[in-house]
Every structure is written in C-alpha cells, then in structure tokens.
Amino acid sequence: MKMCNSDACRPLQGETLDTVFQGRLKIIQPEKGYRFSIDAVLLVGLTRIRQRDRVVDLGTGCGIIPLLLAYQHAIEHITGVEIQESLVSIARRNVLIN
C-alpha cells in the first residue's frame, strides 16, 4: 500500500475515510449522497478478468470498482470515467492513497 502524507490524501469536510479488506484498501468518499457499499465488492468478486485485459468503469464515482479490481487482480490498465468534478477529485486522491 502506498503511503501518502499529503493533504490531498486526507478526507475534506463532508467526506469520510473508510477501509476495505481489513484496512488494506482506503477509500475517501462523500459523507452524503452516493456511497459505495457491499454491492461494489460483490460485483468485483464476480468478475473474470485476466492480467492483460483493459477495463473501463463508466460512472466510477469515488473509484471504488477500479481500486477493488486493482487490489484483487494484477491488471495492467484500468480506467475510471466520471463527469462530476468533485468525484473525479476524490477518485484521484483514492489512487494516491492506495
């Protein structure tokens, strides 16, 4: 896991820092509105992805699905696409802390 001491790696007001896999994966997400839950973890558990596959997550939100996929599979390239600027910022920060 990456260690990030930058302010960009800390949740801002209105955000929370949550963990998955016994703290091995850290996720910043909005305190209100859409928040990931067990459905993202279950979805990733059902995927059959090979190492050289290219993956795109449309509407990635905080980036939970690409982060889970990267954690569970040795994937060379994952792209998360999001149009909400606030969520893009969170997703980028989540990549930094993981």
Feature names for model-found ranges:
Residues 1-6:
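Short, basic/low-complexity N-terminal boundary segments at the transition from targeting/disordered tails
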Residues 45-98:
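Conserved SAM/SAH cofactor-binding pocket of Class I
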Residues 7-51:
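Class I SAM-dependent transferase core
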